[in-house]
Amino acid sequence: MVTALLALAAVTLTLFGVWHLPETATHPFAPWLTLAGAALGVYAFWRIERDWPPPEEPREERMRTQGTRRKAALALFWGGFFVTLAALWAIWRQPFAWNQALTWAAGLILMAVGASQITGWRADRFDEPGPKPDPVYLGHKLGVARVQNAGEQAKPATRRPQRTGASLTARLNLLYYPRPKPWQEALLVVIILSIAMWFRLNHIGQMPPGVFIDETNAALDALHTLEGRADSLFGVGWYETPNGFIYLQTLFFRLLGTTFAAVKLQSILPGVLTVLALCFLAREMYGPYPALLTATFLAFNRWHVNMSRWGWNEVYPPLMQVLSLFFIMRAARRRSLGDWAVAGLVLGLGMYTYLSIRMAVLVIFIYLGYRALVDKSFLRRNWQGVALFALMYAVTFAPLGFTYAKNPFTLLNRTRQVSIMNDVQAADSLQPLLESTKRHLLMFDVAGDRNPRHNLPGKPMLDPITGAFFLLGAAWSLWRWRDHRRGLVIIWVGITLLGGILSRLGEAPQAYRTLAAAPAVALMAADAYNLTWRAVLLPGRRYRFWRWGTTLLMLAGLAAAGWLNYVAYFDEQARSPDVYLAFTPLENEVARDVLAREGSEQLYLSPRLYYFSPVRFFTYRPTHPVGVNLGPIHYSPFDRLGGGLAAPAYQMAEPANDLPLPATGKDATFLLDLDYQYLMDYFHYFYPNAAGEVVRDRLGDPLYFRVHIPADDIAAAVGRRYEGGGLLGRYYHGEDWQGEPFMTRIDPFLLFAWPEEEPTPGPFSVTWTGDLLAPTDGAYHFRLDADDGVRFWVDGAVAGESLEPDRPNTVELTLNLTAGPHPIRIDYFQRGGGKAMRFYWTPPGRPTQPVGPEHLQGHP
């Protein structure tokens, strides 16, 4: 009973302290309660392991195959190895050829299969030297009496072996802590996976509140690949994302098209699979009950749930790391070369997912070295397996490594961009590094990631229940650091946190790059939860009602933790304005607007909106059939073809030159920047019934301006010429306003963001001249945004200029003007890169707006 009371006291103190850790200003005792609870928990866990040690998994052995089978296995392995080497040589010389990639994959498979056959069926588990276990019979066994035949000599009676303390402990373990039957364990795993799926699918259309542009930016890379762009499987793409992930995306798009489901499932599926893989890993480490607890903690973990609901690649490194560790643990237990080979293969394939997998590689190799130090027999028993693991990892990672070797920029560029060394150099001090370390250590229970896409800003990454048991598990793991299982989770969390600690201080704490720590957190929390369960069960384990009551109490604790995560994510986080705004509501609303009108109306989008990746992705229609072809089976998720990425179902809007529109019998809709709400008079010049509307988000903030034009107005205005106000523009080849203009026209207003081929390829320059019609006397503020340079003349004198090439330039000034016309001139040049020119003013008593045609008069 003492152990049970100590464990309950430890949990109570830790839980109470963790609950108030975010409010240490008003609850200064919280850190001390937490520390006291953790220390008391270590003592309680030590007592329970002393008084009632957990049942240990029997060690299995794999026999070395002999004879022909062994020779065939070795031939298969070494044949695969040399095939892989030949493929790597070909990939080094020609990385874009698919036949080399297929040969490389075939060689890896041959190596893994051959290694798995070198060790055969399981040997007797008690072949290890040492004392044999005393046979224990649970329950009553009925003896069958046999009548002795005549002449048969009676056998001498054998004395029943005396039970040892170890055998009695084993008997009690099985009587009062029985292993679940296989069907029971499978049923519980299915229930836990169902919970994990529910947390990751529930209200997926509303939370996150939109598709973030990172999701669709990478998806566009995959669409370019589908369209035939020559991308090596072993190269890198957007933000140095390995192309392996890009090619995986193409599979989703072949099956599901460019749909919302295709984006989300590529992270939901690995998120759920991580829960399953972690269950297997925890079972290898601690047994069935801790495995079920571990999977449950990860199933509803808000940190992992939030990231799993992105359509992005950050969920893959935790999955690959957990799988690799599972095969390593099983390989060490069974001495199976096949498991060692698969572990290296999985970790190597993980390198093709997301950059944070590099931390997983460090975790695993440091763990292997650490285990060799604390377990003297580990390398003696497994040196061949460890060598095979390293070899399989090396040959799997090698093609991507070739890319990094040939172009080191692709290896280190992103790392340098986000490195905390930028802050350290700016501060000329290690203080940013120390502060980042502090923030990451406090992210679990005090203050979490402040990025609204990663977390409810500032909220701890763990709920109080998970957080309390995580701290108890962490303290216990530190105390038992010589136990390689506990040492692993300490290494796992510590190394993974470096991915955030070494990032820019402004991002700290960073939940995105440290997501792979979430499974280790679940392992620690489950370890402490299981030990607490055993401690409470110990004093009354002989009584059924006590066992049932304890089990219900622990299930209630899990349910409470799940509920806290549900409320935090689906209520608090879902209602947060910061979270809503972080998921780019403008891009998402424009995409929904285009999808609703696609095919039924002419659609024109201003240049900024035109290039939004969610719009381009969700409205994509391939130029040729895309899907799956398996012999006579042809399947495509796209119901019709289109113009691909080069020619979407909408056009780029340039209202100054687009009007009047061609008559197609359809209405037309312009989706424009908010600046155009001040230019409705220009639309009404051609279309009296045109209607403009400011589209707002759910918070009431303006997003963009929508103009709808009826088909009848379009037909009536065909051929009409514009004779209103504006500035006379003379367009010249070259950037110095020399020679004859290649184009002269009246531009009603200056809101230009030209595509690459307009108004002419290469450098050009423009001079706009005319009169500015000031409506009243007063102070007028002007702003000219140009890319590249611009000079502004008023009343024959230069009022302002900024003429630096190859960069955006802004001219701002305030002038006192009298009512009436004022001669103005704007000189603009473009050398290369972005092409933009915008002319704004702020008249007295009015908001900032483009200078409209009613206030401009051009002179031929």
Cite the ranges covered by each PLM segment.
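Membrane-interface transmembrane helices that cradle and orient dolichyl/undecaprenyl
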Residues: M111-F126, G130, V322-V342, G350
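Signature aromatic-anchored transmembrane alpha helix within multi-pass, membrane-resident enzymes
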Residues: V190, A390-A394, D527-A568, R720-R721
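Transmembrane-lumen/periplasm boundary regions of multi-pass, lipid-linked membrane glycan transferases
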Residues: N217-L233, L255, A331, L349-Y352, ...
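Hydrophobic/aromatic-rich transmembrane helices and adjacent perimembrane loops
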Residues: M307-S308, M359, P464, F469, ...
